[in-house]
C-alpha cells in the first residue's frame, strides 16, 4: 500500500462477506437481464494537490454507472467514461468543495490534479448535494475503479451497488446477487 494513500477492505469490515469483493465479482453481476446498472465501489483517502495547494481527500473508485445509481448531478464537465472496467484512465471528477479549495476561482475542468503519486485530469465537478456512502459529495474525488486499484494497491471493493430494472424485480435480483456471489466465493 502506498504510504500516501490508504484503501480499505470494508467488505470484511462490514461483515457482509468473508472474502473480499472484486471487480470480477461486480462484472459477474451485470449478467442478468433484470439488472440495469452495477457500480463497484472502492474507497480510500489520499493527499491531493494542485499547484501549492494540498489537502487530504476521500477517493471513490467506480464506473460510469455510479452517476445514475447514486442520482448525482454534475455542476460542470462530464463523468467517468464508459467502457472497460479494467482500463484505468487517469481522469477524475471532483466535489465542489475540492474544486473551491484547490482551484480557487479558476477553472478545474481540464486541469491536472495530483492524487498520491498519480496525476489525473479533472473532467467534471459534482453538484453540491448531500452525502453518499457516508461521505459529503462536495469532498469526494471519483476515479475509475481500475485506477483506484492501482492507487491503493488493492483489489478489495468496499461494496457493489446493483440497480434492478424495476421495483418488482428487486427480490429476484437480490436472490440472484446472493446466489452469484455464493457460487463465485465457493459457498461463502
Question: Can you describe what each PLM-predicted range is?
Answer:
Residues 1-9, 61, 77, 183-188:
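Proteins with a high burden of low-complexity, intrinsically disordered sequence enriched in S/T/G/P/A and R
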Residues 1-58, 65-68, 82-83, 100-101, ...:
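Hydrophobic, regular-secondary-structure patches
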Residues 64-84, 88-187:
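Mid-to-C-terminal secondary-structure elements
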Amino acid at each position: 500500500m502506498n504510504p500516501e494513500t490508504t484503501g480499505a477492505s470494508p467488505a470484511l469490515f462490514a461483515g457482509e462477506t468473508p472474502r473480499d469483493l472484486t471487480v470480477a465479482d461486480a462484472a459477474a453481476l451485470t449478467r442478468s437481464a433484470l439488472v440495469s446498472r452495477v457500480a463497484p465501489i472502492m474507497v480510500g483517502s489520499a493527499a491531493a494537490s494542485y499547484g501549492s495547494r494540498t489537502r487530504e481527500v476521500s477517493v471513490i473508485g467506480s464506473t460510469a454507472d455510479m452517476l445514475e445509481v447514486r442520482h448525482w448531478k454534475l455542476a460542470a464537465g462530464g463523468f467517468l467514461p464508459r467502457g472497460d472496467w479494467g482500463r484505468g484512465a487517469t481522469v477524475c471528477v471532483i466535489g465542489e468543495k475540492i474544486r473551491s479549495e484547490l482551484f480557487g476561482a479558476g477553472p478545474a475542468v481540464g486541469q491536472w490534479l495530483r492524487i498520491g503519486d498519480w496525476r489525473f485530469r479533472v473532467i467534471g465537478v459534482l453538484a453540491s448535494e448531500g452525502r453518499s456512502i457516508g461521505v459529503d459529495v462536495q469532498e469526494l474525488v471519483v476515479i475509475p475503479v481500475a485506477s483506484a486499484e492501482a492507487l491503493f494497491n488493492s483489489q478489495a471493493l468496499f461494496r457493489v451497488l446493483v440497480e434492478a430494472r424495476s421495483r418488482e424485480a428487486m427480490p429476484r435480483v437480490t436472490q440472484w446477487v446472493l446466489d452469484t456471489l455464493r457460487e463465485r466465493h465457493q459457498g461463502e
